[in-house]
């Protein structure tokens, strides 16, 4: 139900009921609590060709926001906190930024940040072009038409299949902006050798790994994966108001 449809002064949509934790442990609400977003309008609501439920909601507190499969991905009001911390986490370990690979990140925020940081060439591997299209339409402040920039090359489809064709030691930076559930941890673990192969010596890999406050075991798994594969790992965090928690980014240097 939308706020504008009733006389009551406040109404909420996108109820995340986490009382049954076993079934809803992939959504970031504290155990036993309900999380609400005030919705002014629903701008998009459809299932993409690759099977993702995509929604663009205009939130009262956070502006236009992307939801995929009923989970908030990005809100225009505080997206810059996420993307800037993400990219700077890798740059802290090594400032080299000739080229980068982005795995996922369909909203375009990480791509925009790489452009703003002065990367010369960016290969953006994204599964679902409809996510990119709908974000360019409604969340233009986030991506800032990144796909139209000369420094960006978009590669559509399964990223891990695509990188099999990439030459060794290509990228200074790899940013893994996938979902933060167990499936994506397993997917990254399965393909970590391929990611390491295309990363330059002394290049850095950074992944968004979720919230250490909400899912400490999940973050630990990411850190262990990076440490096992690269011999080192570091962790950065930033509070994201629309997520209602701190968010973490794990990085490793390819020594």
Region roles according to the model:
Residues 67-68:
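A general beta-strand register signal
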Residues 54, 73-74:
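Short, isolated positions in well-ordered beta-strands
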Residues 2-27, 74-224, 229, 243-245, ...:
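The AdoMet/dcAdoMet-binding core of the Class I SAM-like
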Residues 230-241:
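Conserved S-adenosyl-L-methionine
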Residues 61, 71-73:
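Residue-level signature for short turns and capping positions that connect secondary-structure elements
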Residues 62, 160, 239-241:
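Short, solvent-exposed coil/turn elements at secondary-structure transition points
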Residues 2-64:
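N-terminal auxiliary segments of SAM/dcSAM-dependent transferases
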Residues 253-255:
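C-terminal lobe and adjacent flexible extensions of AdoMet/dcAdoMet transferase-like proteins
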């Amino acid at each position: 139900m939308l706020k504008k449809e009733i006389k009551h002064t406040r109404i909420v949509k996108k109820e995340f009921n986490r009382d049954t934790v076993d079934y809803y442990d992939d959504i970031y609400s504290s155990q036993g609590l309900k999380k609400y977003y005030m919705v002014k309008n629903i701008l998009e609501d459809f299932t993409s060709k690759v099977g993702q439920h995509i929604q663009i909601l205009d939130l009262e507190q956070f502006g236009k926001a992307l939801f995929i499969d009923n989970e908030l991905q990005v809100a225009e009001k505080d997206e810059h906190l996420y993307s800037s911390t993400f990219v700077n986490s890798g740059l802290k370990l090594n400032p080299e930024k000739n080229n980068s690979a982005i795995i996922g990140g369909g909203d375009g925020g990480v791509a925009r940040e790489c452009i703003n940081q002065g990367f010369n060439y960016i290969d953006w591997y994204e599964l679902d072009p409809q996510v990119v299209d709908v974000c360019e339409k409604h969340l233009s402040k986030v991506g800032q038409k990144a796909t139209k920039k000369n420094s960006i090359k978009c590669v559509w489809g399964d990223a891990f299949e695509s990188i099999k064709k990439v030459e060794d030691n290509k990228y200074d930076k790899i940013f893994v902006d996938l979902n933060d559930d167990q499936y994506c941890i397993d997917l990254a673990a399965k393909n970590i050798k391929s990611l390491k192969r295309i990363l330059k010596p002394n290049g850095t890999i950074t992944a968004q790994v979720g919230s250490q406050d909400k899912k400490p075991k999940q973050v630990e798994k990411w850190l262990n994966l990076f440490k096992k594969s690269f011999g080192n790992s570091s962790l950065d965090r930033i509070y994201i108001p629309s997520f209602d928690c701190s968010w973490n980014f794990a990085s490793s240097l390819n020594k």
